[in-house]
Regions:
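Short beta-alpha junctions and helix-cap segments that line functional grooves
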Residues: 3, 105-107, 136, 252-253, ...
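Short, aromatic- and cysteine-enriched interfacial helices/patches
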Residues: 3-10, 28, 35-36
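Switch/coupling subdomain of P-loop NTPase systems
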Residues: 4, 10-16, 21
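Primarily NTPase-proximal linker/entry elements flanking Walker-type ATP/GTP-binding cores
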Residues: 17, 21-152, 159-179, 187-195, ...
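Short hydrophobic/aromatic residue motifs in ordered secondary structure
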Residues: 60-62, 156, 272, 300
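Residue-level signal for short, function-critical loop segments
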Residues: 153-154, 244
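Conserved catalytic-core segment of NTP-binding enzymes
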Residues: 162, 182-197, 211-317
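Short glycine-rich anion-binding loops that position phosphate/pyrophosphate groups of nucleotides
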Residues: 207-209
């Protein structure tokens, strides 16, 4: 590993540590109270731990799964001390994340055999969707890849304008039409343009309205179908962007979008301003969709590739 890569990696780690600070402080404050005055893990400690996990937005189903696994360990060792609880919890959360997040990437990469590699981005307005697209474009361009953006969220003039600002900032082309245009038509034009330009990566924004599930499903299905007329088997990735600071609302949004289309990866944003970072653990587990990216700050470098080991390490540091 080069000297510069080491510096970059340590900077990323510091940003991640800082981004999870609020979640960590709140979580371990609650955990300390949960085991106060107790020397061994008993039913009361487990009940308190359950409350801590649920109130940290890990989600009920995932919390129960973690508690069951810890109970199984306690039944094998009746004298398990509360001082060991951190280690056990860390191992169980790492294990859960490993079930869905099988990759171990730390860099922004795409498969070499798919060109252009097409990412369709979905998510409600206000979750940081446009910002995520801009930061992704920046990271891919930094890797020397040729990137094209598509503004297929045509129902909001601001969405097109915001994407144009990011395209100009990063220095990549944006394919767009006027507000109210057919999103599928924009997607078609974007892929046509990408093929002509021999682009490596295409990132297409889509409507951020959780209106009617059937309408949403029909719209996204049409966009996909039209893409496939230009490039077979696209999109290669359907990336759902969720705002980590909304906690349980993020679960509801994931439910709506996974019902409307096949979501293949997640980006969880705004983790730096919240104590609700536990949502990353719960959503990944409940929906069996890998978390690909996390937003841990407002800077252009603060969108990171999600690495389960680094995440757990920062969480329990």
């Amino acid at each position: 590993m080069s000297f510069f890569k080491k510096i970059f990696s340590s900077e990323k780690k510091e940003t991640l540590d800082k981004g999870l600070e609020k979640t960590k402080t709140t979580f371990f404050g609650k955990l300390s109270k949960a085991v106060a005055g107790k020397s061994k893990v008993d039913d009361e400690v487990l009940d308190n731990l359950e409350e801590v996990l649920v109130s940290s937005d890990v989600g009920v189903n995932t919390t129960l799964k973690i508690i069951e696994r810890i109970e199984a360990r306690v039944s094998k060792d009746k004298y398990l001390g509360t001082e060991e609880l951190n280690t056990i919890l860390r191992e169980e959360i790492a294990g859960l994340l490993s079930e869905t997040n099988t990759g171990n990437d730390s860099e922004f990469t795409i498969p070499q055999d798919k060109k252009p590699y097409v990412i369709m981005v979905v998510g409600v307005n206000g979750v940081g969707k446009t910002t995520t697209i801009g930061k992704l474009a920046y990271q891919f361009k930094k890797q020397g890849l040729n990137v094209v953006l598509g503004a297929a969220d045509t129902f909001r003039a601001a969405a097109i304008d915001q994407l144009q600002v990011w395209a100009d900032r990063v220095g990549v082309p944006l394919v767009k039409q006027s507000m109210g245009s057919d999103p599928a038509s924009v997607a078609f034009d974007t892929l046509k343009s990408a093929v002509t330009q021999n682009a490596d990566v295409v990132i297409i924004d889509t409507a951020g309205r959780l209106h009617n599930k059937v309408n949403l499903m029909n719209e996204l299905t049409k966009v996909k179908r039209v893409m496939q007329k230009v490039v077979d088997n696209t999109p290669n990735d359907v990336l759902l962007v969720l705002d980590g600071s909304t906690g349980q609302n993020a679960f509801e949004q994931a439910k709506q979008f996974t019902a409307a289309t096949e979501v293949t990866s997640l980006a969880v944003t705004k983790l730096d301003g919240t104590a609700k970072g536990g949502v990353v653990i719960g959503i990944s587990d409940q929906f069996k969709i890998p978390v690909k990216y996390i937003g841990v700050g407002e800077g252009i470098e603060d969108l990171q590739v999600f690495n389960k080991f680094e995440f757990v390490d920062s969480f329990f540091k």
